[in-house]
């Protein structure tokens, strides 16, 4: 069997007018031969378009399906040439075992290795997501949470909400006199859900032992990984005038082991985090929510004025949400519902569907891009009203109304091909939509048809700036 090829979406970008779409994700594909040229399927192209639309939207999760006999290209008659004979471009056959896509090639490879060991997409996703928390700790990790969309081999769907929840002591006006407390320190952290979310996924869908799928991340944290450009950039962004990476001993152990911050290409190890993951691998997910790991987490948060308790950790449970679904140019697209923004992504696609000539020719690329931009602006306006269905009245009604044809047609009528509009046109309520700092997205599929799309985050870069000294866990600031 040939070794899996690592394919970056950048290998595809420069071959077509879709080169406006940028992605750093790395895709590992497990296959048996490489005789065919790489032909991206529509299921790869649509998430790429959505990534352009919603790079800043948290929890964008889409799974696309289409009729078996459908040869329809979803962007009409203009088909980009992905078959350039340039020898420098990657080529690969469709995977025989499946495929895993994450932001880091090491983590994608961990997922494929799990597939090769007899695991399925659920096992692979757990391995890759935990790895991302090791390497891309600036925006993801077990101190945070996320949302998953699962498509089973029999084409049923499930949304797993493992977002952080507010501690029991939280109250409505707790940040009224200190808004920074929602961003930095112990009060900024919600109860982490990532481990419970991965536990739910693995126990319901996985086939390999839990310890087996956790071990790759343990080894990556212990043996080390190269410092990349993203980590350098985010350290520079977060350090500020007082460089806590070097001056705070808790952080310096990992980020400045020699007294100065790590540089590009250096090998970074996270031994405390490796020990933490190893304990979770050996004793199970509950080791995160009780015992030493939980106790040290609560101590660290309370030392930074937090109110989270062991009871908050022990009482955490995942939530199962409804799916959102549309038909788009003959394809069925499934996404998540509130509190994530899946319905907004679908709304944008429905607006774009009204343009029959979207990307029809190379000459229409600029106009089509403008239309996408305008649809996104209106989408962001509607996004400001989304909230947690448990605490926001009539959220299901709002989501369903967002996708009715009359709403789509009304939005289309407001879009001009010749200009943009005043901000009030997109968001009449005048609510400010701040830039969202970043999340990590992973997709895993296997040869049974099981497909899982997951978005995880600790919210802002380096979360609440609270690291648990004993475990190396970086806590989220999701209360913001």
Tell what function each PLM region has:
Residues 1-45:
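Short, low-complexity, Lys/Arg-enriched N-terminal segments of secretory-pathway carbohydrate enzymes
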Residues 51-52, 63-283, 288-340, 413-419:
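Noncatalytic scaffold domains of N-terminal-nucleophile
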Residues 78-79, 357-458, 471:
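Internal maturation/activation junctions in enzymes
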Residues 165, 459-461:
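A short acidic/small-residue loop/turn micro-motif
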Residues 170, 461-476:
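A short, polar/charged loop-to-alpha-helix boundary motif
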Residues 343:
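Flexible, polar/acidic helix-loop-strand segments at domain edges
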């Amino acid at each position: 069997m040939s070794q899996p090829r690592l394919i970056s979406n950048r290998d595809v970008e420069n071959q077509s007018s879709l080169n406006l779409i940028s992605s750093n994700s790395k895709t590992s594909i497990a296959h048996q031969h490489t005789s065919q040229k790489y032909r991206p399927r529509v299921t790869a192209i649509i998430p790429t378009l959505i990534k352009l639309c919603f790079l800043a939207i948290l929890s964008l999760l889409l799974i696309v399906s289409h009729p078996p006999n459908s040869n329809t290209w979803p962007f009409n008659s203009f088909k980009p040439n992905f078959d350039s004979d340039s020898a420098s471009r990657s080529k690969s056959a469709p995977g025989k075992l499946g495929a895993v896509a994450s932001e880091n090639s090491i983590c994608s490879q961990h997922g494929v290795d799990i597939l090769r060991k007899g695991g399925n997409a659920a096992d692979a996703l757990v391995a890759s997501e935990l790895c991302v928390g090791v390497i891309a700790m600036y925006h993801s990790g077990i101190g945070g949470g996320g949302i998953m969309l699962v498509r089973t081999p029999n084409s049923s769907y499930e949304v797993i909400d493992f977002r952080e929840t507010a501690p029991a002591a939280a109250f409505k006006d707790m940040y009224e006199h200190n808004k920074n407390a929602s961003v930095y320190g112990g009060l900024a952290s919600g109860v982490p859900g990532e481990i419970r979310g991965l536990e739910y996924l693995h126990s319901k869908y996985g086939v390999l032992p839990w310890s087996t799928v956790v071990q790759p991340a343990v080894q990556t944290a212990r043996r080390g990984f190269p410092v990349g450009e993203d980590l350098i950039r985010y350290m520079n962004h977060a350090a500020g005038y007082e460089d806590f990476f070097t001056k705070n001993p808790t952080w310096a152990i990992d980020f400045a082991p020699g007294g100065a911050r790590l540089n590009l290409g250096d090998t970074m190890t996270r031994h405390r985090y490796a020990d933490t993951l190893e304990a979770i691998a050996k004793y199970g997910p509950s080791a995160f929510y009780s015992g030493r790991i939980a106790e040290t987490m609560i101590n660290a948060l309370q030392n930074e004025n937090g109110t989270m308790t062991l009871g908050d950790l022990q009482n955490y449970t995942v939530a199962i949400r409804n799916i959102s679904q549309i038909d788009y140019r003959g394809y069925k697209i499934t996404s998540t519902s509130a509190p994530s923004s899946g319905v907004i992504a679908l709304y944008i696609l429905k607006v774009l569907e009204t343009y029959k000539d979207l990307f029809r020719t190379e000459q229409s690329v600029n106009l089509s891009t403008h239309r996408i931009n305008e649809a996104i602006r209106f989408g962001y306006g509607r996004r400001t009203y989304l909230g947690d269905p448990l605490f926001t009245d009539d959220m299901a009604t709002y989501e369903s109304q967002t996708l009715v044809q009359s709403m789509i047609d009304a939005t289309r009528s407001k879009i001009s091909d010749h200009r943009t509009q005043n901000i009030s046109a997109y968001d009449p309520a005048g609510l400010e939509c701040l830039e969202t700092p970043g999340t990590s997205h992973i997709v895993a599929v296997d040869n049974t048809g099981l497909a899982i799309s997951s978005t995880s985050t600790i919210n802002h870069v380096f979360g609440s700036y609270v690291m648990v000294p004993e475990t190396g866990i970086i806590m989220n600031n999701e209360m913001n």
